[in-house]
Amino acid sequence: MAIWVDADACPNVIKEILFRAAERTQTPLTLVANQPLRVPPSRFIRTLRVEQGFDVADNEIVRQCAAGDLVITADIPLAAEVLAKGGAALNPRGERYSEASIRERLTMRDFMETLRASGVQTGGPDSLSQRDRQQFAAELEKWLLAVKRRQG
C-alpha cells in the first residue's frame, strides 16, 4: 500500500503531516507535481516530476496507483478515477471520498462550472483551518491503521 499526492495544489501543512506519517509508519509516499518540490530526506518519500499540462499529474497518479493505495487530492475527477480503480481518496480538508459522495461532488462541481461559464462569481474555498488539519490527520491515521490490520 502506498500514498500518492497530487502535490501541485496540496497545502504545505498537509505535506508535513504526510512526511511525518510516512516516516513513522514506513509507508511509501510519492508526491506527483509538474514543478520541483522540497521533501525531507527519507527512503520512504519520493517526488515524481511530470511535464506541465492539463491533468498530466492526475493521469500519472491514476496510471501508477494500485487498488488499496491512498491518493491525496482535492481534484474530484481524479478522486473518482482512483475510487473506480479500487483505491481510496482523501482531500486535504480530511474528507474521505466514497462512491456515494463522489457522485454528489461531481454533480456539484459540474454545476459550479456551468455557473462560472455563465459569468457568475462563485468564489473559492475557505483557507485551511486548524480543524481541517486535524480532520485530515485523523482520516489519514484511520487509513494507516486499516492498512496495518490488513497486513497482519
Curated annotation (Swiss-Prot):
Taxonomically, the superkingdom here is: Bacteria
**Which portions of this protein are annotated as coiled-coil regions?**
none
Q: Which InterPro entries match?
A: UPF0178
Task: Give the range the annotation lists for the signal sequence.
Answer: none
Q: Which Pfam families match?
A: DUF188
Q: Which NCBIfam families match?
A: PRK00124.1
Task: Give the protein family.
Answer: Belongs to the UPF0178 family.
| Protein name, entry field | UPF0178 protein KPN78578_03210
Q: Which organism does this sequence originate in?
A: Klebsiella pneumoniae subsp. pneumoniae (strain ATCC 700721 / MGH 78578)
